[in-house]
Amino acid sequence: KSALPFFISESISKFYYNREPNRKKEIIKAAKISGVENKSFMELTGEMYQQVNIYNNQISVFGKNFTSPISKNCLKHYKFYLLDSLFIDNNWCYQIDFIPKRGGELTFDGSLWINDTTYALKKVKGYINKTANINFINELEITQTFNQVEPEIWMLTKDELFVDFEWLEKGLG
């Protein structure tokens, strides 16, 4: 399916994290938003600026809580398949695909890439299940990439969200 982007948001930032005490700081170096300037569209897409944390048990997407594929209860909601092993950015990783155990649950389909030595999450790509029933959304894809910044510390370095919106032909009422 071909897509023409009509709204793109990009930013480059430096992110600082301190484990003890737990503090985070982000300095945005540059930001650019390109595309349509329609108020109702901007309100709808405003939720796209939410922070998606794959390590949380629940991931909030457009007002609905999805079970993370790496949540504490992931084995109750997902089936996992070891699919491949490959190099990603000089890291040997295992590709593990996941699918929902049952239809109708707020879950994802997708893949995890796990570092073979540290078992850290290198990359995740997830798609909403077609039964999620989110208004105006046909398809949603979340991709996150993590890089090792210290021997035991991996950090989110790339965060992508792709949303395929479906507009109603006629107004409501």
Language-model-detected regions and their locations in the chain:
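Gly/Pro-enriched, hydrophobic low-complexity segments
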Residues: 67-69, 81-82, 91-173
